[in-house]
């Protein structure tokens, strides 16, 4: 959840509005739910995290050269930890950090798909979730860990951690014109999903 919040706030720094803002609704129509720039972050649709409003706004921002400062190389590279976060904090500890020390893992749930945390209230077990999976590397069975939302044999960690660069998919069809009379615009979209970048692989460049 922290990663989504950080991405959301960076979006504001880059000039992005909330998806339900007046600007987005006037220019791109009805609000799209479960996107990173939603005014309330609950769950994110990982297959399409950015709304049309966000995609168009950030594209215009970068095309105008306002993002050139992001190209500066860091003075010093700070290597990340070799261990996955779930190897440091198991599912029970994640429940403690998310909800409080009295919480434990809700039994019978697939923590790799969604982490449910249990607490006893008035003699009954209650399970709560932030609608997010346990972090990468969380133990999910004997010799198994969570990787990309699945419970897999931990020997496959190298396969899941191998980088691959993204490549553009096919263009979609043109959308409706933004105006019925006079000058307007039409949009067509393609996605960086052929394949999608993985494990710090480069995102597609160009338009």
Swiss-Prot record:
SUPFAM superfamilies: Metalloproteases ('zincins'), catalytic domain, TSP-1 type 1 repeat. It is found in: Secreted, Extracellular space, Extracellular matrix. The precursor is cleaved by furin and PCSK7 outside of the cell. Glycosylated. Can be O-fucosylated by POFUT2 on a serine or a threonine residue found within the consensus sequence C1-X(2)-(S/T)-C2-G of the TSP type-1 repeat domains where C1 and C2 are the first and second cysteine residue of the repeat, respectively. Fucosylated repeats can then be further glycosylated by the addition of a beta-1,3-glucose residue by the glucosyltransferase, B3GALTL. Fucosylation mediates the efficient secretion of ADAMTS family members. Residues 165-205 form the TSP type-1 domain. Disulfide bonds join 24-53, 95-117, 106-127, 112-146, 140-151. Zn(2+) binds at residues 8, 12, 18. Its cofactor is Zn(2+). GO terms for biological process: extracellular matrix disassembly; myoblast fusion; proteolysis. Gene3D superfamilies: 3.40.1620.60, Collagenase (Catalytic Domain), Thrombospondin type-1 (TSP1) repeat. It is an enzyme of class 3 (hydrolase). GO terms for molecular function: endopeptidase activity; metal ion binding; metalloendopeptidase activity; metallopeptidase activity. Keywords: Disulfide bond, Extracellular matrix, Glycoprotein, Hydrolase, Metal-binding, Metalloprotease, Protease, Secreted, Zinc. Glycans are attached at residues 96, 168, 171, 180. PROSITE patterns: ADAM_MEPRO, TSP1, ZINC_PROTEASE. GO terms for cellular component: extracellular region. It holds the Pfam family TSP_1. Residues 1-74 form the Peptidase M12B domain. Residues 83-164 form the Disintegrin domain. Binds 1 zinc ion per subunit. InterPro entries: ADAM_Cys-rich, ADAMTS_ADAMTS-like, ADAMTS_CR_2, MetalloPept_cat_dom_sf, Peptidase_M12B, TSP1_rpt, TSP1_rpt_sf. The spacer domain and the TSP type-1 domains are important for a tight interaction with the extracellular matrix. This is A disintegrin and metalloproteinase with thrombospondin motifs 5.
């Amino acid at each position: 959840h922290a990663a989504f919040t950080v991405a959301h706030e960076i979006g504001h720094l880059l000039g992005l509005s909330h998806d339900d803002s007046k600007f987005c609704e006037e220019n791109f129509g009805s609000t799209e739910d479960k996107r990173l720039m939603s005014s309330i972050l609950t769950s994110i649709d990982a297959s399409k995290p950015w709304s049309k409003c966000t995609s168009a706004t950030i594209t215009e921002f970068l095309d105008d050269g306002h993002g050139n400062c992001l190209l500066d190389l860091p003075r010093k590279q700070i290597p990340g930890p070799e261990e996955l976060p779930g190897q440091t904090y198991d599912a029970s500890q994640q429940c403690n950090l998310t909800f409080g020390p009295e919480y434990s893992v809700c039994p019978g749930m697939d923590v790799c798909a969604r982490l449910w945390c249990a607490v006893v209230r008035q003699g009954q077990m209650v399970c709560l979730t932030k609608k997010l999976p346990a972090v990468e590397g969380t133990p999910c069975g004997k010799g198994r860990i969570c990787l990309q939302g699945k419970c897999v044999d931990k020997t496959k960690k190298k396969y899941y951690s191998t980088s691959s660069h993204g490549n553009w998919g096919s263009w979609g069809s043109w959308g409706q014109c933004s105006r019925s009379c006079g000058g307007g615009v039409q949009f067509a979209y393609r996605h960086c999903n052929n394949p999608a970048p993985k494990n710090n692989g480069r995102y597609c460049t160009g338009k």
